[in-house]
Swiss-Prot record:
Protein location: Cell membrane; Cytoplasm
Function: Part of the Sec protein translocase complex. Interacts with the SecYEG preprotein conducting channel. Has a central role in coupling the hydrolysis of ATP to the transfer of proteins into and across the cell membrane, serving as an ATP-driven molecular motor driving the stepwise translocation of polypeptide chains across the membrane.
GO terms assigned for molecular function: ATP binding; protein-exporting ATPase activity
Enzyme class: translocase
Organism per entry: Staphylococcus aureus (strain MSSA476)
Gene: secA2
Gene3D superfamilies assigned: Helical scaffold and wing domains of SecA, P-loop containing nucleotide triphosphate hydrolases, SecA, preprotein cross-linking domain
Membrane topology qualifier: Peripheral membrane protein
Cellular-component GO terms for this entry: cell envelope Sec protein transport complex; cytosol; plasma membrane
Protein name: Protein translocase subunit SecA 2
GO biological process annotation, one example: protein targeting
Domain of life according to the entry: Bacteria
Catalysed reaction, written as an equation: ATP + H2O + cellular proteinSide 1 = ADP + phosphate + cellular proteinSide 2
Subunit-level organization: Monomer and homodimer. Part of the essential Sec protein translocation apparatus which comprises SecA, SecYEG and auxiliary proteins SecDF. Other proteins may also be involved.
Length: 796
């Protein structure tokens, strides 16, 4: 019933969209007769009509899409089909276009990008990796330039490239920017650490199209982008605590829920820790560092698996994206967890650095005025797209009917039996000359099968999501006669597999999937590697009771599973009941995995709310400071009055010595100690006196400046220094707080409530500290000039 309702709703949406397609086609007939110059002139005309208010982007859409479509034919030799027009309309409306593999998402995106770039505001195409961003940019740039728009790649494609001053601004000063989610996120954070208006480079986040949108804003939604700062004061307990944790026994000393990534000490574990470390009360304030390290060691030891969550590679811990299987070099777990894993692996513990700035992809894309996305598997995530982002998913029809045959799962008792049968099937397929793509969950499994196939004299290409450009080329060749490719689930994603000559007659590409993934969307993406644009093909998933999905997520009765496992092999092969039972177990395990993924993203979203609100407020304040252009005539008296009232109210007893000390520490190094006229019992009199000292010091500082221009720079810098130093402390504190709250409490609601309560308290403390540091900085900072006459500010 639900499926029928979904189909009906989708058809109603398509019916409305097709009316716009008809108008595009009508305009298309007209613009075909235009000369090249006349067609190019339409871009200028569109901009003028938008600027004058004659048209909006919505009213321009049919004509603008027709122009972009015709230009695409003249420049690229590609004429967008009606299904691509449907996708392009969905994208402009700010929704999710589900378009199958090979349906031309890259070309589809050019029309909404062209339309939205006419506004002169920031327009972005965001994809998952540098290779895809560069490939699509280079392919489509000639179209935009022919139409009179500028386009750029939002980064320099050189490893470890160091950007020169102003270079980032030049990259972003274009109508359309192609980039990746990671690079855009880090650029946003860097942009908001700028110490001058000239140092900012990121244009408005107005409109964006996200390729592989489910991968970025669902699967990776809770991934934090982190800019690290100074090293933290580091514990030396990592290795010692690891040795203690090795002595603990599950269900005796500790309990864990692997599905929820939760682990905690039981009473016997607490007693063992107190005895081992000779502490009287493990949860006393004095032992909190020890408790934190024990919790980290437990999580590292039991909740993070080698070759599943991370690799040990060249002496480093390299994280793995569990959904995509792709390695994440340079990415580190926060709050000491990375160091705990290093200790687990017997490695030298690296330095844990404080967090300067952070944002999740979820909150990054919520900064856009409007964004949309493309994916082949949007419908399966529709409820989450709507709940988190208020986006609907429209299933765009394929240009040609899908001919791929998705075979029923092949069921086996053990992984060994499964592997033997799977290799047998691969050999049979390979002997016919049919290309085969074998997909595994892990790089370790891919390497194993690649070696086995080589031993059987079947040459193969191995793709384990390490070299994106090389793998894109290899995956593109996976449709040739006799081709054998072994890959992880993410390797080569975004590249179409085109069938070689004669392959269609053999039945197309055969996709063999070693096991169900933790998410049904990924399963569907993998099946979709075959059967592009109406090509023939097939897919089949092989399952067993030994599969990772079953072992990690199944909540079936263990005795029942063991009973199934021990059945006679002869009976198994003839048992439809067995097949159904195993399929039920696998499907249920996958559903639990997906539900836990949704809950984890919801939880991360809840935790992120505090820092997101605080970050927005702090960045707004920074921007206000950067906009100061007349500091000489600004009145900072109200700011100082707030700070001095804080001081007098925080002091239980005001004395002459305390006030003099405060002046030396915060206002002037040259105070003459003349306080005879001050009544220290009258708090308001003390505030008035401090204001007089503040204004004297401010006037002296202004006098020492060479010009109003330099004074303006001085004020901006000292205020930014106050904001940034306090904000960096707050960000790092919130990261530590989130980790500690999660460790202290298993009840999610309580953990979230506790986090937000403490986060709000700490934010209020931070805002007071910012004001205090602003006053201190503007009074006690010094400005000197170097040999070139440039100002150098020395902060107190």
């Amino acid at each position: 019933m639900k499926h029928k309702l979904d189909v009906t709703i989708n058809e109603l949406r398509l019916k409305s969209i097709r009316k716009i397609v008809k108008r595009i086609n009508t305009w298309g007939d007209e613009v075909k007769s235009y000369s090249d110059d006349a067609l190019k002139q339409k871009t200028i005309e569109f901009k003028e009509r938008l600027a004058s208010g004659v048209d909006t982007l919505d009213t321009l859409l049919p004509e603008a899409y027709a122009v972009a479509r015709e230009a695409s034919w003249r420049v690229l030799g590609m004429y967008p089909k009606e299904v691509q027009l449907i996708g392009a309309i969905v994208l402009h409306e700010g929704n999710i276009a589900e378009m199958q593999t090979g349906e031309g998402k890259t070309l589809t995106a050019t029309m909404p990008l062209y339309l939205n770039a006419l506004s002169g505001k920031g327009t972005y195409l965001i994809t998952t990796n540098d290779y895809l961003a560069k490939r699509d940019f280079e392919e489509m740039q000639p179209l935009y330039e022919w139409l009179g728009l500028t386009a750029s790649l939002g980064f320099v494609d050189i490893v470890d490239y160091e950007y020169q001053k102003g270079e980032k601004r030049n990259l972003y000063e274009h109508d359309i920017i192609y980039t990746t989610n990671g690079r855009l996120g880090f650029d946003y954070l860097i942009d908001n650490l700028a110490d001058s208006a000239e140092g900012k480079f990121l244009p408005q986040l107005n409109y964006g199209i996200i390729d592989e949108v489910d991968s970025i804003i669902l699967d990776a939604a809770q991934t934090p982008l982190v800019i690290s700062g100074a090293p933290r004061l580091q514990s030396n307990l990592f290795h010692i605590v690891k040795e203690f944790v090795d002595t603990l026994i599950e269900d005796v000393h500790f309990k864990m829920k692997k599905t929820k990534k939760e682990i905690w000490l039981l009473n016997q574990g607490i007693e063992a820790a107190q005895s081992y470390f000779n502490v009287e009360d493990l949860y006393s304030e004095q032992a909190m560092v020890l408790v934190r390290n024990i919790n980290l060691a437990l999580r590292a030891q039991y909740l993070f698996e080698s070759n599943v969550d991370y690799f040990v590679y060249n002496g480093d811990i390299v994280l793995i994206d569990r959904i995509t299987g792709r390695m994440l070099p340079g990415t580190k777990l926060q709050a000491g967890l990375h160091q705990a894993i290093e200790a687990k692996e017997g490695m030298e513990v690296s330095t844990d650095k404080s967090v300067m700035a952070t944002i999740t992809f979820q909150n990054l894309f919520k900064l856009f005025e409007s964004f949309s996305g493309m994916t082949a598997t949007g419908k399966l995530g529709e409820s989450e797209f709507f709940d988190l982002y208020s986006k609907i998913v429209v299933q765009v029809p394929t240009d040609k009917a899908i001919q791929r045959i998705d075979e029923p799962d092949k069921v086996f008792r053990s992984v060994d039996e499964k592997n033997i049968a799977m290799i047998h099937d691969i050999v049979e397929l390979h002997e016919t000359g049919r290309p085969v793509l074998l997909i595994t969950r892990t790089a370790e499994a891919a390497e194993y099968f690649s070696k086995v196939l080589f031993q059987m004299d079947i040459p193969n290409n191995l793709l384990i999501a390490q070299n994106v450009a090389k793998e894109a080329q290899m995956i593109a060749e996976a449709g040739q006669i006799g081709s054998m490719t072994v890959a992880t689930s993410m390797a080569g994603r975004g590249t179409d597999i085109k069938l070689g000559e004669g392959v269609e007659a053999l039945g197309g590409l055969a996709v063999i999937i070693h096991e169900h993934m933790e998410n049904s969307r990924v399963d569907r993406q993998l099946r979709g590697r075959s059967g592009r644009q109406g090509d023939p093909g097939s897919s089949c998933i092989y399952i067993s009771l030994d599969d990772y999905l079953v072992k990690r997520w199944s909540d079936s009765n263990l005795a029942e599973n063991n009973q199934l496992y021990s059945l006679d092999a002869q009976r198994l092969s003839q048992s439809n009941l067995f097949n159904r039972k195993v399929k039920q177990i696998v499907v249920k395990a996958q559903r639990i995995s997906e539900e836990q993924g949704v809950k984890a993203r919801e939880m991360a979203n809840e935790f992120e709310k505090s820092i997101s609100i605080q970050r927005d407020l702090v960045y707004e304040e920074r921007n206000r400071v950067l906009e100061i252009d007349d500091a000489e005539n600004q009145d900072f008296k109200a700011l100082a009055k707030d700070v001095f009232e804080m001081f007098v109210n925080e002091e239980k007893v005001l004395t002459k010595s305390r006030v003099v000390e405060y002046i030396y520490q915060n206002l002037s190094f040259q105070f003459n100690k003349d306080v005879a006229c001050v009544n220290f019992k009258d708090k308001q009199a003390v505030v008035t006196f401090l204001l007089e000292q503040f204004e004297k010091q401010l006037a002296l500082n202004r006098k020492n400046m060479q010009s109003a221009y330099y004074y303006n720079i001085f004020v901006q810098k000292v205020f930014l220094k106050a904001i940034d130093s306090c904000w960096l402390e707050q960000v790092d504190y919130l990261q530590q707080l989130k980790a500690s709250v999660n460790q202290r409490q298993n009840g999610q609601r309580n953990a979230i409530f506790e986090y937000h309560r403490v986060a709000l308290d700490s934010f209020e403390v931070m805002t007071r500290n910012i004001k205090k540091r602003m006053v201190k900085n503007i009074c006690q900072s010094m400005i000197t000039f170097d040999k070139e006459g440039m100002p150098v500010i020395h902060f107190p």
